[in-house]
Every structure is written in structure tokens, then in C-alpha cells.
């Protein structure tokens, strides 16, 4: 699975299906489905900080790449 890395993120909220992520790369926090987070991601739950790794497909759909 191809992946896309977004550095210096923070999870500010989580649900059973998604996390709400803040990043300097986003104008506003973005919801990211758990199913689109790559196993190499450093963030998974509320309070986590680090690099977010998502599928390349999801990043393309969001206009991040």
C-alpha cells in the first residue's frame, strides 16, 4: 500500500472510526478514518503527537498531494 506522510500532527479528538487531526499543513483540523491510517503512523488516539501516515489514495482524495 502506498503511503503519504504528514509531519508534526496532533490528534485532538477520536471516535471509534476516525481521528480529528491538527497540522500546520491544514487550514482546519481534518477527520481521518481509522481505515485510512497506515500501520507506520505515529498517531492513533487523542493526545498523540507525531507523523501521520495515511494511504496515498486518501491523501489524493483530500487534495493533500
Regions found by a protein language model. Give the residues of each.
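Catalytic phosphate/metal-binding cores of nucleic-acid and nucleotide-processing enzymes, i.e., regions
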Residues: 1-65
Amino acid at each position: 500500500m502506498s503511503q503519504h506522510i504528514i509531519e508534526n500532527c496532533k490528534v485532538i479528538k477520536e471516535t471509534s472510526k476516525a481521528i480529528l487531526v491538527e497540522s500546520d499543513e491544514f487550514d482546519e483540523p481534518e477527520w481521518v478514518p481509522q481505515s485510512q491510517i497506515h500501520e507506520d503512523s505515529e498517531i492513533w488516539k487523542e493526545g498523540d503527537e507525531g507523523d501521520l501516515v495515511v494511504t496515498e489514495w486518501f491523501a489524493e482524495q483530500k487534495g493533500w498531494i
